[in-house]
């Protein structure tokens, strides 16, 4: 028979990891279920060397460092972690929830969903022959291996701008965006404009020039024009964002707003006892940042504790007094 947990956290990214740690501070029996093969979510898998700018008090913190610190924080507690396990159904029983996964079943008194944007994969570059080129990349695992190489980046959001600024320190860097304006933090855009990065706007990639295995040049075409330019490069990085899939979320009987779980001020969903935090939840004024999700975690945990035992105060002691 499955053990009965106080709190089951669905998602092992930064927000889920911190929620598990905080749940232990409330002496809850907690476990984590994640469909990915490793903890840490997108920062660990896609951005291990990218600086995370919205965690207060930790300048120059990378995705890998953030993940390692959160795991280290959790290591002092007994936390069953189920990786490569996808949640299929969450069913309300008399006094608990039955969670059916791709590998089995779990019983829990409450659920905190911290699955971010769900399963994710990069939005691909759609040009003829793109699949065969080995020097077209969608994420960076070791930035130093590109030192001194000619790097071109496609995209206009935070990731594209941040990576351009990071690569500029070690390599000749070109950034190509189809619009004149960038969709990134104002401070980052200003830093980009003051940097040595070669900025090509408004241009879009139009042709790959190489031998089918190694890309040597990229042809770009000015938007609403026939004007073309050719960029010599050693590596091409595509930062067009990600396609996310919430998978079975729509089958869990929760009220949604555009594939996000609607929550109240307790971080509670339309089903009492099920909470949502981080990028997977929605409320008026919601901002999708790691810092926001980290703040939502204690709210969900404390209200879950109160749901389990109404005599437990929602407002706990401060950690400094524990």
Swiss-Prot record:
Entry EC no(s): 1.18.1.2
InterPro entries the UniProt entry points to: FAD/NAD-bd_sf, FAD/NAD-binding_dom, Fd--NADP_Rdtase_type_2, Ferredoxin-NADP_redctase_2
Transmembrane portions of the chain: none
Catalysis: reaction(s): 2 reduced [2Fe-2S]-[ferredoxin] + NADP(+) + H(+) = 2 oxidized [2Fe-2S]-[ferredoxin] + NADPH
Family indicated by similarity: Belongs to the ferredoxin--NADP reductase type 2 family.
Subunit field text: Homodimer.
Protein name (record): Ferredoxin--NADP reductase
Organism, scientific name: Streptococcus pneumoniae (strain Hungary19A-6)
């Amino acid at each position: 028979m499955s053990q009965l947990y106080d709190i089951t956290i669905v998602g092992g990214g930064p927000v889920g990891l911190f929620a598990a740690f905080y749940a232990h501070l409330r002496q809850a029996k907690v476990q984590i279920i994640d469909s990915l093969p490793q903890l840490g979510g997108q920062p660990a898998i896609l951005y291990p060397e990218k600086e995370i700018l919205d965690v207060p008090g930790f300048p120059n913190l990378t995705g890998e460092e953030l993940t390692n610190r959160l795991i280290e924080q959790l290591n002092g507690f007994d936390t069953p972690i189920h990786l490569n396990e996808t949640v299929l159904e969450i069913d309300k029983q008399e006094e608990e929830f039955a969670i059916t996964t791709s590998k089995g079943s779990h019983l829990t008194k409450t659920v905190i969903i911290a699955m971010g944007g769900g399963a994710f994969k990069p939005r691909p570059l759609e040009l003829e022959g793109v699949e065969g080129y080995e020097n077209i990349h969608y994420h960076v695992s070791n930035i130093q291996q590109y030192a001194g190489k000619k790097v071109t980046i496609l995209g206009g959001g935070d990731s594209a701008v941040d990576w351009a600024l990071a690569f500029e320190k070690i390599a000749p860097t070109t950034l190509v965006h189809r619009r004149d304006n960038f969709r990134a933090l104002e401070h980052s855009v200003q830093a980009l404009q003051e940097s040595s990065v070669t900025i090509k706007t408004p241009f879009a990639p139009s042709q790959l020039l190489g031998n089918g295995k190694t890309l040597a040049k990229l042809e770009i075409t000015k938007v609403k024009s026939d004007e073309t330019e050719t960029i010599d490069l050693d590596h091409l990085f595509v930062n067009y964002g990600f396609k996310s899939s919430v998978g079975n979320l729509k089958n869990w009987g929760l009220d949604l707003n555009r594939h996000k779980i609607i929550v109240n001020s307790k971080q509670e969903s339309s089903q009492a006892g099920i909470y949502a935090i981080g990028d997977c939840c929605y409320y008026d004024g919601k901002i999708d940042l790691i810092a926001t999700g980290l703040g939502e975690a204690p709210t969900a945990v404390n209200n879950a504790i109160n749901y389990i035992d109404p005599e437990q105060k929602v407002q706990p002691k401060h950690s400094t007094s524990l």
